Amino acid sequence: MAETATRSDSGMFWKATTYKEQYWDGYLAARPKYSSDFYERIVDYYKAHNPSPPTPTVAHDVGTGPGQVASELCKYFDKVIASDPNSTHLAVASARNEKSGLNHKITWTEVSAEDLNSHYPAGSASFLAAAECLPLLDVPRALNTFAHLLHPNGTLAAWFYGRPVFSEPTVAAKCQPILNDIIDLTFEKVIKGAPPAHKTTWKRSTDTLYSFLDNVTFPAETWRDVYRFKWNPHLPLSVVGPNACDYPIEPSSCIDPEREKVVEAKDPHFWEEVWDISEVRRFVECLLPNIEDLKSKGVYDHVEVKYKELEEAMGGDNAKKEITWPVVLILATRV
């Protein structure tokens, strides 16, 4: 395969622009695994609010990335439309689903979430998933597009997870501040050196994540039965912290308590992983596909010092520690 080149399309994260399978294997291995009961919660909501959908049933996976959510949706829907603005992501997702024999159910579309309404007709979908992407979008435009795509009683499911967090309190006290420093040091040059347009995108996203998506508005004339499920909401949802940013972080909330239900749970075992230092490193480094280029230029040396510090705090090279995640899931029904 060709080496991975990178670009910064959205101003949010560096995106791979050529298909290098090794990177994507590492990316998926470094991500939390969406549990079966998590998907069941979503599907149960969909079935309860849309008992007689038009057939064939159509689901959208917006911002599909390497396509793991599209694969899961094939279990529940007749057709799946997986979209992403990055052609490399679509090539990866298509190749992976070809191996699984699922491509006959999936249509791959290169388009941004905000512009899907120019590709698909109104009311053409029963379900739309926006996994790990909503804060990275122009949210009002994206929600208008999602409302355009969904037929009445169709379901929107949007979720996001934050940085990995050490579960056990004594371990977290020693290790989490070091991991937070590693992430912030890794990203500060990307954020602080961003051009103005990208900086605006970074701030918008950071504000939304520090709000735990509570600043995402669901107008009553368009959406009903809005549920906001939060796991570990005492932990920051944003991957980057204030030290990586050179702008004020301004969380806010527009939750309507008369129309929306918020369900919170503190669960140190939610999507639990057990990681050693190499797996923690993999999570951070897979956020930036050009990490090897940064290392070769020497701009990553100060971060390596922090990794050694974290390794010692975790108990050495082979020591494994429990990891959990802050997560938010929003479910809403199209009026």
Swiss-Prot record:
Reported consequences of knocking out the gene: Does not affect the methylation of the naphthoquinones derived pigments and only abolishes the production of pleosporalin A but not of the 2 other final products.
Induction of synthesis: Expression is significantly up-regulated at the end of late growth phase, in the presence of Butyrolactone I. Expression is positively regulated by the pgm cluster-specific transcription factor pgmR.
Chain segments annotated as transmembrane: none
EC supergroup of this enzyme: transferase
Assigned EC number: 2.1.1.-
Keywords: Methyltransferase, S-adenosyl-L-methionine, Transferase
Pathway note: Pigment biosynthesis; Secondary metabolite biosynthesis
UniProt cross-references to CDD domains, sorted A to Z: AdoMet_MTases
Domain of life the protein comes from: Eukaryota
InterPro entries noted in UniProt: Diverse_substrate_MTase, Methyltransf_11, SAM-dependent_MTases_sf
Any GO molecular function: S-adenosylmethionine-dependent methyltransferase activity
Pfam families linked to this entry: Methyltransf_11
Any one GO BP annotation for this protein: methylation
Family the UniProt entry places it in: Belongs to the methyltransferase superfamily.
Job description of the protein: Methyltransferase; part of the gene cluster that mediates the biosynthesis of pleosporalin A, ascomycone A, as well as a third cryptic naphthoquinone derived pigment, all responsible for the coloration of conidia. Essential for the production of pleosporalin A, but not the 2 other final products. The pathway begins with the biosynthesis of the cyclized heptaketide 3-acetonyl-1,6,8-trihydroxy-2-naphthaldehyde by the NR-PKS pgmA.
Name of the protein in its database record: Methyltransferase pgmE
